[in-house]
């Protein structure tokens, strides 16, 4: 017994040495200094507190070189297989380094504002970027979204067809997987641990080791490729948009947190079997144009993309508590002092202006889409991820797989655009080719600013973004700001609008809810 125990201890010791050697290393050629970004947390009383945050760029964009030198381990879209002979050896031999955010990646911040440039030319040409909000130098900020709302300003006026300025949440580890995977020495500080509902296989490192084995360089992306492994987790797309179209989309997974997948069993964009994985790659999307309203979002339209807009997303629960079950995802916009409720779907068979179980089920049926949303947990599955906490991602990208046509054009391109769900925007079906977009619009950019987070009704009536600066107050029965209260009939239900300048709908809330004045333009049943 004693000798067996000694052997066991020796094996453990050897294993720990091996892990220490075969690790995802950190380089020393460039100091890592995260750009600062302020944001705010708000309370139900209407007060907001500024948080001095920072952002880090994803490890996939970083210089990857030999630990003790300057030789690239990865150049263009190819690994140096003389260095990276296996996933484990590559982790031992190669290091990710610090980033020069402005000159290399076109990432700049000022106060609460973050600007991401599309094409940045330095020693190499950089395309787009993906950054994460940090709690401190080594930890991502975790957002717990149930029974809360998330608000930010965005300027998409310089984003043409084929680009996507995306704001979303994913179920990454707060430390980037550093504590869970002993071979990950870089951690969140260097942007490790990414995952999403596509189970991306284009990541150079997953779970602390490289993804070199089975790597196939892309024919269309000079910087990317696909390896044997992917990284899966739940994803909540708050905002995927350019100046033409926008969508918000929950994507649940069987397991909310980050997991490893292999080959086509990953499913999603990067695999031959799109629905073969443990996540929902399609999600349940709300795109106003796809839902039949062709005049709601775009240049000069109701939500005018020629100007910045405040985007408000609410995550409602069945019992109005932080521990309840996710029941509805609502959207509002604020522009030029006016609160704009999300557009209503024009399809009688698929009504509504928010995401609910009923909306998603009827949409899948009407559009003829495969209902993988329900298969992977639906709203309850998404709620499980929101409850565990998610990391905020802010990005700008183009699409080497479908040219972003799923967002802003007719898709599939060979389908009848008069059929429900096919038309998603006004972009031509031959638009969005990355090489063309990069050549024609190198100066494209997106600006995100004024991020706020707090209880329902707390973030967009208190000077947030381009919205009004009035204070949130509560009325016992009806809104005192609407000039049309005497002509309104019926009752507004929980969370619905019940007043505001120019409002002509119901101003009395169903019991026991009270009409709450969020600002002079908008009151809500809370």
UniProtKB/Swiss-Prot annotation:
Glycans are attached at residues 293, 400. One of its GO terms (molecular function) is cellulose binding. It is found in: Secreted. One of its GO terms (cellular component) is extracellular region. Residues 1-23 form the signal peptide. SUPFAM superfamilies: Cellulose-binding domain (SSF57180), Concanavalin A-like lectins/glucanases (SSF49899). One of its GO terms (biological process) is cellulose catabolic process. Residues 459-490 are annotated as: Ser/Thr-rich linker. The keyword Lyase does not apply. Disulfide bonds join 498-515, 509-525. Keywords: Carbohydrate metabolism, Cellulose degradation, Disulfide bond, Glycoprotein, Glycosidase, Hydrolase, Polysaccharide degradation, Secreted, Signal. Residues 490-526 form the CBM1 domain. The active site is at 235 (nucleophile), 240 (proton donor). Residues 468-488 have a biased composition (Low complexity). Residues 464-488 are annotated as: Disordered. Residues 24-458 are annotated as: Catalytic. Gene3D superfamilies: Glycoside hydrolase, family 7, domain. Its EC number is 3.2.1.91. It catalyses: Hydrolysis of (1->4)-beta-D-glucosidic linkages in cellulose and cellotetraose, releasing cellobiose from the non-reducing ends of the chains. The biological conversion of cellulose to glucose generally requires three types of hydrolytic enzymes: (1) Endoglucanases which cut internal beta-1,4-glucosidic bonds; (2) Exocellobiohydrolases that cut the disaccharide cellobiose from the non-reducing end of the cellulose polymer chain; (3) Beta-1,4-glucosidases which hydrolyze the cellobiose and other short cello-oligosaccharides to glucose. Belongs to the glycosyl hydrolase 7 (cellulase C) family. This is 1,4-beta-D-glucan cellobiohydrolase B. The lineage of its organism: Eukaryota, Fungi, Dikarya, Ascomycota, Pezizomycotina.
């Amino acid at each position: 017994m004693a000798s067996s125990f000694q052997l066991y201890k020796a094996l453990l010791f050897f294993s720990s040495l091996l892990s220490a050697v075969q690790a995802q290393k950190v380089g020393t050629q460039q100091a890592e200094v995260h750009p600062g970004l302020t944001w705010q947390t708000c309370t139900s009383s209407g007060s907001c507190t500024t948080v001095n945050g920072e952002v880090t760029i994803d490890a996939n964009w970083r210089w990857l070189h030999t630990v003790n030198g300057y030789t690239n381990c990865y150049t263009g879209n190819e690994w140096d297989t003389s260095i990276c002979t296996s996933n484990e050896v590559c982790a031992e031999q190669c290091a990710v380094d610090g980033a020069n955010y402005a000159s290399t990646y076109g990432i700049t911040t000022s106060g609460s504002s973050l600007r991401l440039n599309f094409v940045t030319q330095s020693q190499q040409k950089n395309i787009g970027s993906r950054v994460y909000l940090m709690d401190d130098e080594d930890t991502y900020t975790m957002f717990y979204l149930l029974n809360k709302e998330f608000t930010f300003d965005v300027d998409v006026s310089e984003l043409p067809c084929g680009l996507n300025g995306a704001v979303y949440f994913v179920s990454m580890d707060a430390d980037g997987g550093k504590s869970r995977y002993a071979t990950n020495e870089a951690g969140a500080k260097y942007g490790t641990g990414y995952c999403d509902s596509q189970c991306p296989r284009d990541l150079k490192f997953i779970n602390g080791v490289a993804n070199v084995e089975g790597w196939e360089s892309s024919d269309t992306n000079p910087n990317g490729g696909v390896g044997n492994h992917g990284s899966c987790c739940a994803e909540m797309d708050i905002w995927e948009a350019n100046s033409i179209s926008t969508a918000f989309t929950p994507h649940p997974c069987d397991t909310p947190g980050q997991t490893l997948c292999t080959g086509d069993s990953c499913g999603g964009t990067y695999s031959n079997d799109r629905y073969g994985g443990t996540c929902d790659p399609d999600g349940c999307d709300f795109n106003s144009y796809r839902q039949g309203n062709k005049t709601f979002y775009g240049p000069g339209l109701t939500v005018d993309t020629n100007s910045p807009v405040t985007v408000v997303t609410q995550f409602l629960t069945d019992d109005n508590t932080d521990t309840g079950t996710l029941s509805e995802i609502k959207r509002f916009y604020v522009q030029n002092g006016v609160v704009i409720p999300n557009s209503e779907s024009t399809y009688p068979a698929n009504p509504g202006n928010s995401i609910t179980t009923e909306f998603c089920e009827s949409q899948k049926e009407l559009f003829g889409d495969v209902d993988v949303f329900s298969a992977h947990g639906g709203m309850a599955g998404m709620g499980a991820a929101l409850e565990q906490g998610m990391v905020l991602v802010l990005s700008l990208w183009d699409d080497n797989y479908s040219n972003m046509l799923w967002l802003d054009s007719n898709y599939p391109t060979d389908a009848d655009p008069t059929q429900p769900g096919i038309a998603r925007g006004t972009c031509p079906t031959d638009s969005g080719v990355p090489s063309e977009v990069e050549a024609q619009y190198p100066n494209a950019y997106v600006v995100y600013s004024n991020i706020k987070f707090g209880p329902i009704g707390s973030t967009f009536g208190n000077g947030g973004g381009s919205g009004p600066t009035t204070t949130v107050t509560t009325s016992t029965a009806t809104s005192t700001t609407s000039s049309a209260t005497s002509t309104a009939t019926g009752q507004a239900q929980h969370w619905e609008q019940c007043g505001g300048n120019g409002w002509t709908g119901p101003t009395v809330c169903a019991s026991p809810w009270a009409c709450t004045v969020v600002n002079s333009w908008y009151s809500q049943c809370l």
